């Protein structure tokens, strides 16, 4: 996976805007490009699809974490008329802490597809939630950290058929299933639940969860998890 480490590429994808006016929501000004998958008080998850030659309209984003499901060549125009072009690879992952305004066009020959997790509530955590059993530490063969900063941690999760992880914990997370399948979820009290999850499944958890997962199907399951470091879990 490609991490967001190049300043010029950060400027391309997430260019800052100091505007105080009413935000131009991408799903409202360009509904043919942006589809809302999930929206609550904390986050908004958007599926973004640019066909070759397709453009959106000038719009704003909350602070955002993004993952390129399908990369390509994009042109980004800023409110001041500045234009940038860049080849963005599949798997490219990034995060911006500021609100942004820009317009994007696919100037390549293939479809570009992006998952955006916009952070609507970014207040600092006011109290410690304690030390969690981190999945990437107890099951590094399943969980790979592809981006981490003070705000978020992004995990690439891959379960081969028959593969399971070890008991672990999550804080506040948002997740998107790149490739679904049949999973078995085991809780600390021994409760077991099987579930069929489709490609593109999306969700958000605001409590601390402790569990163990196993792929009991015949296909590889792949998930992207965004852990929110600045959101306190709700106490059950």
Model-derived features: positions:
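Short acidic-glycine-tyrosine-enriched beta hairpin
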Residues: 39, 80-98, 189-207
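Histidine-centered metal-chelating micro-motifs
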Residues: 53-56, 82, 94-105, 162-165, ...
